[in-house]
C-alpha cells in the first residue's frame, strides 16, 4: 500500500493536458461508484419503482446493460459493517441480483414499496431514529472481469483514468445523467499513465455508459467499506476542459 501511494503521489506531481474529446475512459472502483453506480442505484430503489419514477419500471427481464455486468447487493459478506441477517423491518435478508449479465433482474423493496409494486420485500429495508423504513443497499458487488487493469491500460493510445469527482450527484439521478469535475484523474498515453489532469469535467448518462462497455478488470477494490468493485473501461463519456 505504501509503495502504491508513493507511486500515485509521484505521478500526480506531473500535470498534463486534458486528453482529446471522445477518448476512452477508465473508472477506478471509487470513480465507478461516484460516477455511474450512485445515480444508477437510485433507479433500483423500490421507492422510485413503486411510483413509476424510475426508468426501469416494467422492464424486469430486459437486457438494458452490457452482458459483462453482474451487479448484486449481498448482505452476507463476512466482516463487512453493512452485512446483516435481518433488515430493519425484521425481514430475512438475501443476496439480490440487480443486473445479471446485462439483464435487469430485480429492484430493491421494503414491505411498503413491495406491496405497492405487487412484489415481495427483498429484505432491503433500512431506517434511522428520524425516518420510516425505506429501501436501501447493503454490500454492493460487481463481478470481476477476465483482464488485468494493467492490460486494459496498455491497450489505450490516449485516454483518462477517473478516480475521484468533485460535485458528483448534482445531475438528474433518476435519468442517469451525471456531470462533475474530476478532482483526481490521470492521463493515459501510449499505454502508460503519464500524469494528472486538472480543470477537467466529465459528463454523460450512466445507462448509456453501462450499456456498451469495453472491459471490466479482474482486480477489485473495497470502496467505502461495503462495496467490492472493479475498474471499468467505457467510451460513452464526454470529456471537456
Regions found by a protein language model. Give the residues of each.
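N-terminal small-residue-enriched
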Residues: 1-241
Amino acid at each position: 500500500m505504501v509503495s502504491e501511494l508513493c507511486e500515485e503521489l509521484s505521478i500526480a506531481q506531473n500535470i498534463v493536458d486534458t486528453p482529446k474529446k471522445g477518448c476512452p475512459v477508465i473508472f477506478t472502483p471509487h470513480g465507478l461508484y461516484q460516477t455511474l453506480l450512485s445515480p444508477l442505484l437510485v433507479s433500483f430503489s423500490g421507492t422510485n419503482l413503486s411510483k413509476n419514477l424510475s426508468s426501469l419500471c416494467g422492464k424486469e427481464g430486459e437486457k438494458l446493460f452490457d452482458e459483462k455486468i453482474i451487479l448484486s447487493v449481498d448482505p452476507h459478506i463476512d466482516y463487512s459493517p453493512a452485512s446483516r441477517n435481518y433488515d430493519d423491518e425484521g425481514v430475512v435478508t438475501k443476496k439480490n441480483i440487480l443486473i445479471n449479465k446485462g439483464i435487469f433482474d430485480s429492484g430493491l423493496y421494503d414491505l411498503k414499496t413491495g406491496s405497492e409494486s405487487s412484489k415481495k420485500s427483498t429484505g432491503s429495508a433500512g431506517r434511522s431514529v428520524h425516518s420510516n423504513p425505506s429501501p436501501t443497499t447493503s454490500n454492493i458487488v460487481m463481478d470481476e472481469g477476465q483482464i488485468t487493469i494493467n492490460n486494459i491500460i496498455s491497450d489505450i493510445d490516449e485516454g483518462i483514468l477517473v478516480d475521484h469527482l468533485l460535485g458528483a450527484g448534482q445531475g438528474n439521478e433518476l435519468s442517469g445523467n451525471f456531470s462533475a469535475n474530476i478532482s483526481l484523474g490521470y492521463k493515459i498515453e501510449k499505454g502508460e499513465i503519464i500524469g494528472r489532469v486538472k480543470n477537467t469535467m466529465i459528463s454523460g448518462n450512466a445507462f448509456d455508459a453501462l450499456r456498451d462497455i469495453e472491459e471490466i478488470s479482474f482486480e477489485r477494490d473495497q470502496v467505502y467499506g461495503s462495496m467490492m468493485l472493479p475498474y471499468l473501461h467505457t467510451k460513452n463519456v464526454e470529456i471537456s476542459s
